[in-house]
A protein has these predicted regions:
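Acidic, Ala/Val/Gly-enriched low-complexity intrinsically disordered segments
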Residues: 1-8, 15, 20
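Signature of N-terminal electron-transfer/Fe-S-associated modules in redox systems
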Residues: 13, 17-196
Length: 196
């Protein structure tokens, strides 16, 4: 699988990985594969937050579960498990994606950044600071995904309008805040990032 992954920016999702299938050895399972082939472990190499990880995963393992269960990076949350809420948003090769829509094998050879990779030592990323300063969270469950989406926005658009911020957050749901403080948090971070 190539690290040049085609990302559908409208949904923050990726196309489903389709392994090569030996047509003489199919019995009608997943993608026509035998049960043994369906669950055969696949070696992958993924750089997460600047650290290379070599692992062996089942082809059906979602990136979110690889990050959480295999690497212990539990800052990436599983909210809806249906690609609706955005709580699982990470950066894959510099793009914000919902990691519940990406198979771990699709990330083979890729660069992944999670919420744990944003801080610089003891110093929070400006977006993390903004959420603290402007009270952009309540229960906090959506916060990692919101922050990862906001960081992606500010890296590509350093001075977004309120409407651009709201549009960028369309794939992220929050049941607590009403979004006003989230938008204010991102505006605060935008100003801080432009001044530094």
């Amino acid at each position: 699988v190539s690290p040049d992954i085609d990302v559908d920016s409208g949904t923050n999702g990726l196309a489903i990985f389709s392994p090569e299938i030996n047509s003489s050895n199919t019995t009608g399972g997943l993608l026509g594969m035998t049960a043994e082939a369906e669950y055969a472990a696949v070696p992958i190499s993924v750089t997460v937050n600047g650290v290379k990880h070599d692992a062996v995963v089942e082809p059906r393992t979602l990136l979110v579960f690889f990050l959480r269960d295999s690497l212990g990076l539990t800052g990436t949350h599983v909210g809806c498990d249906t690609s609706q809420c955005g709580a699982c948003t990470v950066h894959l090769n510099g793009r914000a994606v919902k990691s519940c829509t990406v198979l771990a094998v699709q990330a083979n050879g890729a660069q992944v950044r999670t919420i744990e990779g944003l801080a610089n030592g003891d110093h929070f990323h400006p977006v993390q600071q903004g959420f603290h300063e402007k009270h952009g969270l309540q229960c906090g469950y959506c916060t990692p995904g919101m922050i990862m989406t906001a960081v992606h926005l500010l890296e590509s658009q350093p001075n977004p309008s309120d409407d651009e911020i709201k549009h960028a957050l369309e794939g992220n749901l929050c049941r607590c805040t009403g979004y006003v403080n989230i938008v204010e948090s991102i505006k605060w971070a935008s100003e801080k990032m432009r001044k530094s």
